UniProtKB/Swiss-Prot annotation:
Its main location: membrane. The lineage of its organism: Bacteria, Pseudomonadati, Pseudomonadota, Gammaproteobacteria, Oceanospirillales. Residues 57-127 form the POTRA domain. Residues 51-258 are periplasmic. It comes from Alcanivorax borkumensis (strain ATCC 700651 / DSM 11573 / NCIMB 13689 / SK2). GO terms for cellular component: cell division site; plasma membrane. Coiled coil: none annotated. Belongs to the FtsQ/DivIB family. FtsQ subfamily. Signal peptide: none annotated. This is Cell division protein FtsQ. Residues 1-29 are cytoplasmic.
């Protein structure tokens, strides 16, 4: 095998070029680390400055729509004061506010929302009381008892009294008799019902009616006909009308009581 020939005298070896990493690859490699660094920096700045930024949007007001009495307005605002104190627009606990509001006995339904930049707004549907039951609770128009005597004016509500377990039946009597009496512009101011469901009604003209549950609708209609034809002109002189008779009624005049 022939030996390598020596390089000619005076000839120089060409330097070997180092092949570098292309710029595109260097940039591609560096970008993820740059992004990681940027995200870390943003996160650090958020931790440092975000609380201070959010403190610039504190909750200053609680708006309540749908509440028709200042007593109930004040009660709901007082109940929510601790939940919104020191809270900001973004951190205010809407679910807790909803639960606290819905827990008030006179609230039928409520919705809660934020209103930029510093307000929580509640839209409330109130329970509408139609009667006072046994001087201890109110009864809503859907027949549900609820405790809120101090939150309503009771003078304009009829006062119904009867066996605790007979509320539904008593309310049925009240609505049915009230509808019949309304035909002659009479209304029930109070009603006492005993265990046998005999009712004593005091009307808005101070007249007292006594009626038992047997055929009470027929008996009330008979009274309405008599009232429209005879008793209306002297109704203030009538103290009591007893309707517990199959075919008639007993009228007691005020002069008879004195």
């Amino acid at each position: 095998m022939a030996k390598n020939a020596p390089a000619p005298r005076g000839a120089r070896r060409k330097p070997v070029k180092k092949v570098g990493v292309p710029l595109r690859e260097r940039v591609a490699t560096a970008v993820p680390w740059m992004l990681v660094g940027s995200v870390a920096m943003v996160s650090l700045l958020a931790v440092i400055y975000l609380p201070a930024a959010l403190d610039g949007y504190p909750i200053r007001k609680v708006g309540v729509d749908g509440v028709t009495d200042v007593r109930r307005q004040q009660q709901i605002e007082t109940a929510l004061a601790a939940l919104v104190r020191e809270e900001n627009y973004f951190s205010v606990p809407l679910e807790e506010i909803y639960q606290q509001s819905q827990g008030l006995s006179w609230v039928e339904e409520v919705s809660v929302r934020r209103q930029w930049p510093d307000t929580v707004v509640l839209t409330v549907e109130e329970r509408r009381p139609v009667a006072v039951w046994n001087e201890s609770v109110l009864v809503s128009d859907s027949g549900q008892p609820f405790k809120a005597l101090k939150q309503y004016d009771l003078d304009d509500l009829p006062h119904l009294n009867g066996p605790e377990q007979r509320l539904e039946e008593v309310m049925g009597f009240y609505h049915s008799m009230g509808k019949t009496l309304a035909d002659v512009d009479l209304s029930i101011r109070s009603m006492e019902v005993n265990a046998r469901l005999t009712a004593r009604l005091t009307l808005n003209n101070d007249m007292e009616l006594v009626v038992d549950r047997e055929h009470y609708t027929t008996k009330l209609r008979r009274f309405v006909r008599l009232y429209r034809g005879v008793l209306n002109t002297d109704s203030r002189q009538v103290a009591r009308v007893d309707l517990r008779y199959a075919d008639g009624m007993a009228v007691t005049w005020r002069e008879q009581q004195s």
